[in-house]
UniProtKB/Swiss-Prot annotation:
Gene: cas9
EC number(s) on file: 3.1.-.-
Record text about domains: Has 2 endonuclease domains. The discontinuous RuvC-like domain cleaves the target DNA noncomplementary to crRNA while the HNH nuclease domain cleaves the target DNA complementary to crRNA.
Organism: Neisseria meningitidis serogroup A / serotype 4A (strain DSM 15465 / Z2491)
Residues binding Mg(2+) 1: 16, 504, 508
Top-level enzyme category: hydrolase
Protein name: CRISPR-associated endonuclease Cas9
Length: 1082
C-alpha cells in the first residue's frame, strides 16, 4: 500500500477529550482563519484508568493481594523460624517432624493449653503448640499513640476491640488473653476468633507479650525444663518484631524532588509554611464580583483576612463577607451560589496549625485564648517529622532535641499527617514573602525562578512529547491526556502541523470519582425534574401537539418563578397564550452579543414587544438605572420579589458591565487540566497559526450552544461517534467565527432561544437557524454525513462505509457544494486502544474443595448471607438434611430471595424435640468444575481469572483457539490445547507442529470473520472457553447492532476467513497483520 502523502493544509485541530474517549476533527481555514472545509475526523476510545464501579485505582486490587501474600509469607517464615528454634533448644526432636518439616501429632487445642499452662506443667508437644499459637496469632501492635483518633471505620473498630479487651484484662477477672477468650468469648458468642467484619475479639500484642512472660514463669515453677533464657528471648523476638512502615528517606525517595529546587525534597503539606502558601494562593486569587465588574481584594481587605484562618478553626466565605463588609450585591467568584447556603463552605482551614494547637490544649499545655506559641520554623519541623515518619520512636528521634518532652508527648498522642506538596520548603520560603506582598503564585515564581512551571522546555518540536506523570497525578486524567497526545501526533504524522489546536475537556475530566458520581446524581435529578416539568406542562396544555421541547418547559418554569408577570413591563402573562408564536419570548437579560452568556441565570420571560424594545441593552441601561428612574425601581422590585436564586437576581440587576471579562469567562474553559494542556502544547509543539495564542480551551456550554444553532443532533446513547461531532464544533469555534456570530446577534437583536428574529426594515420574521452564521454552506448536512455515514434523520439509510460510497453520497446530497468531496474523505471508524497486558489476577479469590474434581464437581462453603435459592438447590447433603433445606428455603422465600435480609438474624438448627441447637452460618454447595487453578498444594481449586490472550491456529481450513490465562503467564506455561466445544480441557485438541500459527488476539484487537452467512468486522471482545466462540465489539458500539453493540457467539472454527488487522490511533490506517512466529508468554 502506498504511503499517504497529503498536500500541505492550513487547518485547525479540534479535540473533545473525555475520561475514556478523544474525539478529533480537522477543519481547513482560510487566511483570515475562517473555517471553510471539513478535512477529516475520528474517535479514539480507551478504557478509563480506574475500576469502573468503585473508582479505585487499577493497582489497588494488586496492591491489596500483594499485601496479603506478603503477610502470609511472613507468617509462614515466622513459624518456620519458631520450629527451628524449638528444635535447636531441644524442645522437639527430629522424630517429631514429618518430611515437610511440620510437627507431627501437634495438639489442636492451643487456647485450652494456654489456659492450662497457668496451672500445670505441659508436655514438650503441648508447650510447642502454645508457643507456635502465640506467634501465629500475635494480635495487633500499635506504633502510634494517636491511632485511636483515626477516621478509618475498620481501623477504629479494631482499635476499640483491642482497647475493650485490654480493659477487661486490667480488671483482674482474667489472668491472660487465653482465659478471657475461653471464659468470655466462647461462652457469650460461641466462637473465639473474629468473624466477618467483627474485631471485638482482637488482643493487643503487648497483652500477649505479658501472657508469654507469665507462661514462662509458671512453667518454670512447674518444672518444665524448656524455659531457657535463649528460648524465651527467641520466642519473644518472633512475637514482637514487626517491619517498620515506609518512612523517612524511603518516603522522600518515592515523592521525588522540588519543581524549582531539584536537590530539595518536597515539603509536607501540614507544615506552617506550606499551609501559609496555600492560604496566600487562595487569598491572592480571590475575586469579588460586584455590579458586573470583577476585582481582586484591596491591600486593606487582604490585611483584614490575612490572620483570620489562625484565629478561627475554619474561615468560611460568610465570615469573610462579614469581615470585609461587602454589600449584598457583591459575590465571591467561583462559588456555586445555586446550592443552599453556598457561603457556609470553607474558604480556608489551617489544619496542621489548629491540630497542634488542639493537641496542646488537650494536655493543658496551651491557653485557649492565646495563639500557638511555636515558631514557624519549629512548626515546619513538626509537620515534616509527623508526615515522614510513621512510628512514635522515629518521630521522637527526629524531634527530641527540638521540643520539650511534655509537648512532644502531647503531639504524639493527638496528631498524624501524611500529605505533601510539589515544592520544597526552601522554595516556599523564597516565594511566600512575595505572595505576602500581594503577588500571585505565578508572578512570584516568575520573579524568582523565571517561570511558573520551573525550568520549562521551550524547544518546539513537530510531535508532542509524553505527558509528564509527575505533573498530572490523577491516573484517569493522565491516561486521557496521553491518548489525546497520541491522536495529536497521529494527525501531525498524517497531515502535517496544524495552525491551531482547540481543546474541550468533558467536565468530569479532572474530577474525583466521588465528584463524578455527584455530577451523575445531579444529572439524574435534573432529568427527573425535566420529566416532572414536562408532565406539568402537559397538565396545563392538554391539547399541545407532540412532546414539549426544552424551550416550552423553560417558559413555564420562568412563568412560575416570575409570578406570571413579564419581568420588563410587569404586565400579567396570559398562561393560555404561553405557546402562542411571538406572544412571549425568552430573553437574555444581559445581551448574548455582549456576554456570550447562555446560562439559566441570564434568561427571563418577557412579552415579545418588550423584548424588541429592549434590544441590545442591559436592564440597567434599558430602564435608565443611572438616574434611578421609576421604571428601574419597579423593575428591581419585580426581580427582588421573584423566585429567582440569589445569584440570578444579582446578575439581572448588574449596573457596571465588563463585556470583555464576561466573554472571556464564557468562551474559555480555565480549569487546571485545560490550562495545563494548553500551556504544555503551546510550549512544546510547532504550530503554524498567526498570533501568540494558538491553543484555545473551549467552554463546553458554548459547544452545546453552537451545536444546537448549527443543527447538529447529538444522541450519546446511540454510539461512540458523537465525540467527533463535538470535535468539529470545537474546531470551528474560531475567533473569526465568534466575531461573525457576535455581529449577527447584535445586528438582528436576536433572542438566542426564540428561533426567530425580526428584520426591522421589513418586519419579516426570519428563522434563526437559516440565517445564523454557519461555518460554511450545508455545514450540518455535511458534518452529519461525515460522522454517521448517512443523512441525518434517516436511520434506515445504508451506511456509506467505504471512501467511494461516502464520496458518492456527499456528491448526491450536497451537489451544490463540490468542496465537500475531496481526497481526504474517508468513513469514520472508531479506533479502540488494545489491551496487550499479559499480567493480571491469577485466579479468583474463592478457593473450593477439589476432593470430587474427578466427578467434575467442586464444593464451596457459602455464607448464609450470600446464599440464593439457586445455590440452595445444590446444597451438599440436601437429601440427608431435609429439615435444614426446607427451613433455609422458607427463610429465603419469605424475603424474596434476598439472603442479606433473610439471614440478618442468626439461623439455628433444631432437634427432634424442637429445641434450638447449633447456629448455622454457612452451607456447602456443589458447583460444576471442569477446569481451574490448583492451589494449596493441590488441596483446593479456584476458577480461572483473566484470559490475557488467545492464540489462533489453522489446519485443514479450520481455525483453533488456544486460551492463555494470567496464571500460565506467571508460571511461564505456553498452553498447547485448543478449545473443543463441550469437552473438558484434558480432552481439548492438542496443538502440534502440523498446525500453523496465525496470530495472537488480545482484547480490542481488530478482527475480521467471514462465514457463509455474513462478514463481521470489529474488535475482539472475549472468547468462550466452553464453546470456542468469540464475541466481537462493533467499532462504534452501535447499540442497535447485536447486544448493545456486541456480536455474541461467533463460531470461527469453520469460518471461510479469520484475519487480524492493525489500526492506528486515528482509525485511518487499517491493514492485515503480517504473519509472525508464536510469541512466548514471558
Amino acid at each position: 500500500m502506498a504511503a499517504f502523502k497529503p498536500n500541505p493544509i492550513n487547518y485547525i485541530l479540534g479535540l473533545d477529550i473525555g475520561i475514556a474517549s478523544v474525539g478529533w476533527a480537522m477543519v481547513e481555514i482560510d487566511e483570515d482563519e475562517n473555517p471553510i472545509c471539513l478535512i477529516d475526523l475520528g474517535v479514539r476510545v480507551f478504557e478509563r484508568a480506574e475500576v469502573p464501579k468503585t473508582g479505585d485505582s487499577l493497582a489497588m486490587a494488586r496492591r491489596l493481594a500483594r499485601s496479603v501474600r506478603r503477610l502470609t509469607r511472613r507468617r509462614a517464615h515466622r513459624l518456620l523460624r519458631a520450629r527451628r528454634l524449638l528444635k535447636r533448644e531441644g524442645v522437639l526432636q527430629a522424630a517429631d517432624f514429618d518430611e515437610n518439616g511440620l510437627i507431627k501429632s501437634l495438639p489442636n487445642t492451643p487456647w485450652q493449653l494456654r489456659a492450662a499452662a497457668l496451672d500445670r506443667k505441659l508436655t514438650p508437644l503441648e508447650w510447642s503448640a502454645v508457643l507456635l499459637h502465640l506467634i501465629k496469632h500475635r494480635g495487633y501492635l500499635s506504633q502510634r499513640k494517636n491511632e485511636g483518633e483515626t477516621a478509618d471505620k475498620e481501623l477504629g473498630a479494631l482499635l476499640k476491640g483491642v482497647a475493650d479487651n485490654a480493659h477487661a484484662l486490667q480488671t483482674g477477672d482474667f489472668r491472660t488473653p487465653a482465659e478471657l477468650a475461653l471464659n468470655k468469648f466462647e461462652k457469650e458468642s460461641g466462637h473465639i476468633r473474629n468473624q466477618r467484619g467483627d474485631y471485638s475479639h482482637t488482643f493487643s500484642r503487648k497483652d500477649l507479650q505479658a501472657e508469654l512472660i507469665l507462661l514462662f514463669e509458671k512453667q518454670k515453677e512447674f518444672g518444665n525444663p524448656h524455659v531457657s533464657g535463649g528460648l524465651k528471648e527467641g520466642i519473644e523476638t518472633l512475637l514482637m518484631t514487626q517491619r517498620p512502615a515506609l518512612s523517612g528517606d524511603a518516603v522522600q525517595k518515592m515523592l521525588g524532588h522540588c519543581t524549582f529546587e531539584p536537590a530539595e525534597p518536597k515539603a509536607a503539606k501540614n507544615t506552617y509554611t506550606a499551609e501559609r502558601f496555600i492560604w496566600l494562593t487562595k487569598l491572592n486569587n480571590l475575586r469579588i464580583l460586584e455590579q458586573g465588574s470583577e476585582r481582586p481584594l484591596t491591600d486593606t481587605e487582604r490585611a483584614t483576612l490575612m490572620d483570620e484562618p489562625y484565629r478561627k478553626s475554619k474561615l468560611t466565605y460568610a465570615q469573610a463577607r462579614k469581615l470585609l463588609g461587602l454589600e449584598d450585591t457583591a459575590f465571591f467568584k467561583g462559588l456555586r451560589y445555586g446550592k443552599d447556603n453556598a457561603e457556609a463552605s470553607t474558604l480556608m482551614e489551617m489544619k496542621a496549625y489548629h491540630a497542634i494547637s488542639r493537641a496542646l490544649e488537650k494536655e493543658g499545655l496551651k491557653d485557649k485564648k492565646s495563639p500557638l506559641n511555636l515558631s514557624p520554623e519549629l512548626q515546619d519541623e513538626i509537620g515534616t517529622a509527623f508526615s515522614l515518619f510513621k512510628t512514635d520512636e522515629d518521630i521522637t528521634g527526629r524531634l527530641k532535641d527540638r521540643i520539650q518532652p511534655e509537648i512532644l508527648e502531647a503531639l504524639l498522642k493527638h496528631i498524624s499527617f501524611d500529605k505533601f506538596v510539589q515544592i520544597s520548603l526552601k522554595a516556599l520560603r523564597r516565594i511566600v514573602p512575595l505572595m505576602e506582598q500581594g503577588k500571585r503564585y505565578d508572578e512570584a515564581c516568575a520573579e524568582i525562578y523565571g517561570d511558573h512551571y520551573g525550568k520549562k522546555n521551550t524547544e518546539e518540536k513537530i510531535y508532542l512529547p509524553p505527558i509528564p506523570a509527575d505533573e498530572i497525578r490523577n491516573p484517569v486524567v493522565l491516561r486521557a491526556l496521553s491518548q489525546a497526545r497520541k491522536v495529536i501526533n497521529g494527525v501531525v504524522r498524517r497531515y502535517g502541523s496544524p495552525a491551531r489546536i482547540h481543546i474541550e475537556t468533558a467536565r468530569e475530566v479532572g474530577k474525583s470519582f466521588k465528584d463524578r458520581k455527584e455530577i451523575e446524581k445531579r444529572q439524574e435529578e435534573n432529568r427527573k425534574d425535566r420529566e416532572k416539568a414536562a408532565a406539568k406542562f402537559r397538565e396545563y396544555f392538554p391539547n399541545f401537539v407532540g412532546e414539549p421541547k426544552s424551550k416550552d418547559i423553560l417558559k413555564l418554569r420562568l412563568y412560575e418563578q416570575q409570578h406570571g408577570k413579564c419581568l420588563y413591563s410587569g404586565k400579567e402573562i396570559n398562561l393560555g397564550r404561553l405557546n402562542e408564536k411571538g406572544y412571549v419570548e425568552i430573553d437574555h437579560a444581559l445581551p448574548f452579543s455582549r456576554t456570550w452568556d447562555d446560562s439559566f441565570n441570564n434568561k427571563v420571560l418577557v412579552l415579545g414587544s418588550e423584548n424588541q424594545n429592549k434590544g441590545n441593552q442591559t436592564p440597567y441601561e434599558y430602564f435608565n438605572g443611572k438616574d434611578n428612574s421609576r421604571e428601574w425601581q419597579e423593575f428591581k422590585a419585580r426581580v427582588e420579589t421573584s423566585r429567582f436564586p440569589r445569584s440570578k437576581k444579582q446578575r439581572i440587576l448588574l449596573q457596571k458591565f465588563d463585556e470583555d471579562g464576561f466573554k472571556e469567562r464564557n468562551l474559555n474553559d480555565t480549569r487546571y487540566v485545560n490550562r495545563f494542556l494548553c500551556q504544555f502544547v503551546a510550549d512544546r509543539m510547532r504550530l503554524t497559526g498567526k498570533g501568540k495564542k494558538r491553543v484555545f480551551a473551549s467552554n463546553g456550554q458554548i459547544t452545546n450552544l453552537l451545536r444546537g444553532f448549527w443543527g447538529l443532533r447529538k444522541v450519546r446513547a446511540e454510539n461512540d461517534r458523537h465525540h467527533a461531532l463535538d470535535a468539529v464544533v470545537v474546531a470551528c469555534s474560531t475567533v473569526a467565527m465568534q466575531q461573525k456570530i457576535t455581529r449577527f446577534v447584535r445586528y438582528k437583536e436576536m433572542n438566542a432561544f426564540d428561533g426567530k428574529t425580526i428584520d426591522k426594515e421589513t418586519g419579516e420574521v426570519l428563522h434563526q437557524k437559516t440565517h445564523f452564521p454557519q461555518p460554511w454552506e450545508f455545514f450540518a448536512q455535511e458534518v452529519m454525513i461525515r460522522v454517521f455515514g448517512k443523512p441525518d434523520g434517516k436511520p434506515e439509510f445504508e451506511e456509506a462505509d467505504t471512501p467511494e460510497k461516502l464520496r458518492t453520497l456527499l456528491a448526491e446530497k450536497l451537489s451544490s457544494r463540490p468542496e465537500a468531496v475531496h481526497e481526504y474523505v474517508t468513513p469514520l471508524f472508531v479506533s479502540r486502544a488494545p489491551n496487550r497486558k499479559m499480567s493480571g489476577q491469577g485466579h479468583m479469590e474463592t478457593v473450593k474443595s477439589a476432593k470430587r474434581l474427578d466427578e467434575g464437581v467442586s464444593v464451596l462453603r457459602v455464607p448464609l448471607t450470600q446464599l440464593k435459592l439457586k445455590d440452595l438447590e445444590k446444597m451438599v447433603n440436601r437429601e440427608r438434611e431435609p429439615k435444614l433445606y426446607e427451613a433455609l428455603k422458607a427463610r429465603l422465600e419469605a424475603h424474596k430471595d434476598d439472603p442479606a435480609k433473610a439471614f440478618a438474624e442468626p439461623f439455628y438448627k433444631y432437634d427432634k424435640a424442637g429445641n434450638r441447637t447449633q447456629q448455622v452460618k454457612a452451607v456447602r454447595v456443589e458447583q460444576v468444575q471442569k477446569t481451574g487453578v490448583w492451589v494449596r498444594n493441590h488441596n483446593g481449586i479456584a476458577d480461572n481469572a483473566t484470559m490475557v490472550r488467545v492464540d489462533v491456529f489453522e489446519k485443514g481450513d479450520k481455525y483453533y483457539l488456544v486460551p492463555i490465562y494470567s496464571w500460565q503467564v506467571a508460571k511461564g506455561i505456553l498452553p498447547d490445547r485448543a478449545v473443543v466445544q463441550g469437552k473438558d480441557e484434558e480432552d481439548w485438541q492438542l496443538i502440534d507442529d502440523s498446525f500453523n500459527f496465525k496470530f495472537s488476539l488480545h482484547p480490542n484487537d481488530l478482527v475480521e470473520v467471514i462465514t457463509k452467512k455474513a462478514r463481521m468486522f470489529g474488535y475482539f471482545a472475549s472468547c468462550h472457553r466452553g464453546t470456542g466462540n468469540i464475541n466481537i465489539r462493533i467499532h462504534d458500539l452501535d447499540h442497535k447492532i447485536g447486544k448493545n453493540g456486541i456480536l455474541e457467539g461467533i463460531g470461527v472454527k469453520t469460518a471461510l476467513s479469520f484475519q487480524k488487522y492493525q489500526i492506528d490511533e486515528l482509525g485511518k490506517e487499517i491493514r492485515p497483520c503480517r504473519l509472525k512466529k508464536r510469541p512466548p508468554v514471558r
